[in-house]
């Protein structure tokens, strides 16, 4: 058993840490570039309907791309079972040359924007940005010509450091972004010894930026951690205060009031939940499907966690989790969530008021799919074969599932298989 976690770090360590964070904040403020070329396209986030911020880990920059206006979209399902083939054709390459980096839905448009790395077979992969509509039409954004402004990411991780031999540490320079009231909040890594970093940029970019390092208590590992970055985050109003809600690998959930994000600060995040080991967050969205504001956290290797903002606020008002889990019988601690069967997603985003959009791999073919799911139901009926799917099955009178099955089968492109209405 590991020793108990100390409540305070040694003063010498805090001094070194403060120097490192101060140097990082100076580097962030040192440069502001207009229209720097994109060397990679990774994490992305919409600031508004016409402005998309793309993180460029190779170039150590953020790029705010101005998109031409888009016509308002009509709510419809994505039912694209091989979006990788359509994207590859538009980029004049093969599907196995594509690496899908991130996905976001343009507000009000029903258009999914996807960042990719395209491997030509020689040299550094090229960045790409495409849009996809619900009919499967792919639009390619010309990254060399599209209007954009750029901001430097100071003290990015070194390009020559790797995880597991071949994963550049610098790919985690930006892991997620969130916008609120003229500020862009950027999670990721720096090259400081306390590597987990939250950078805050004035937006539109004007050269002003701050940086704070982040530590959190990890109940699975039973230790304070200062290196592992935030993987997914969003901003919610908790108990009347704008607060960052953030998830880490393996899988603590923490809260950080935005007022604590001061330049050069070292933030002790409050751990409010432990959702279990052996997985990494891949998506976090907030929505109201008729039962009040909810947060859905999806993971790489386990079921998603659904929780109300009210419950998150209640947990944030308490002291927080400071003790380890009891492995393996009690893998969770703190805030309780509802398990939702959404394992295996690569990316998820709010599509509109009623739908979620998701990228996922087809288990049999390996093709990337772009699909929609209804908020509140969190499934695609056509993923499963069960009693209802046999040709001789008959719904009983007033069967509560008849209407839901009819709606979902129609949504997913199987209107001919929908049960007749009563």
Model-found features: residue ranges?
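N-terminal secretory signal peptides that target proteins for export/translocation
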Residues: 1-15
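Sequence/structural signature of beta-propeller domains
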Residues: 33-422
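Bacterial N-terminal signal peptides
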Residues: 15-29
């Amino acid at each position: 058993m590991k020793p108990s976690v100390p409540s305070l770090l040694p003063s010498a360590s805090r001094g070194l840490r403060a120097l490192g964070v101060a140097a990082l904040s100076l580097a962030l403020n040192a440069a502001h570039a207009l229209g720097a070329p994109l060397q990679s396209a990774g994490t992305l986030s919409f600031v508004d309907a016409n402005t998309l911020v793309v993180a460029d880990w190779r170039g150590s920059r953020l790029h705010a791309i101005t998109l031409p206006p888009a016509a308002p979209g009509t709510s419809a399902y994505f039912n694209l079972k091989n979006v990788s083939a359509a994207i590859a054709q538009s980029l004049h390459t093969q599907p196995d040359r594509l690496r899908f980096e991130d996905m976001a839905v343009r507000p009000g448009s029903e258009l999914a924007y996807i960042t990719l790395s395209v491997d030509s077979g020689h040299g550094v992969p090229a960045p790409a940005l495409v849009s996809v509509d619900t009919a499967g039409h792919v639009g390619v954004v010309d990254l060399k010509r599209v209007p954009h402004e750029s901001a430097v990411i100071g003290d990015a991780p070194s390009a020559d450091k790797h995880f597991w031999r071949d994963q550049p540490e610098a790919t985690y320079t930006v892991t997620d972004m969130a916008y609120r009231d003229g500020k862009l909040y950027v999670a990721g890594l720096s090259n400081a010894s306390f590597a987990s970093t939250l950078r805050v940029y004035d937006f539109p970019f004007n050269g002003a930026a701050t940086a704070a390092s982040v530590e959190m208590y990890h109940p699975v590992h039973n230790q304070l951690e200062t290196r592992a970055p935030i993987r997914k985050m969003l901003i919610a109003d908790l108990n009347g205060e704008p607060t960052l809600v953030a998830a880490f690998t393996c899988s603590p959930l923490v809260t950080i009031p935005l007022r604590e994000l001061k330049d050069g600060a070292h933030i002790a995040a409050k751990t409010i939940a432990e959702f279990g080991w052996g997985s990494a967050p891949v998506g976090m969205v907030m929505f109201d499907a008729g039962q009040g504001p909810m947060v859905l956290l999806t993971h790489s290797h386990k079921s998603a966690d659904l929780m109300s903002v009210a419950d998150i606020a209640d947990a944030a008002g308490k002291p927080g989790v400071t003790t380890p889990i009891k492995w393996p019988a009690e893998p969770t601690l703190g805030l309780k969530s509802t398990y939702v069967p959404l394992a295996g997603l690569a990316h998820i985003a709010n599509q509109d008021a009623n739908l979620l959009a998701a990228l996922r791999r087809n288990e049999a073919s390996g093709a990337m799919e772009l699909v929609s799911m209804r908020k509140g139901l969190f499934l695609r009926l056509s993923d499963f074969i069960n009693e209802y799917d046999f040709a001789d099955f008959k719904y009983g009178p007033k069967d509560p599932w008849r209407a839901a099955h009819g709606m979902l089968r129609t949504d997913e492109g199987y209107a001919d298989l929908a049960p007749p209405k009563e």
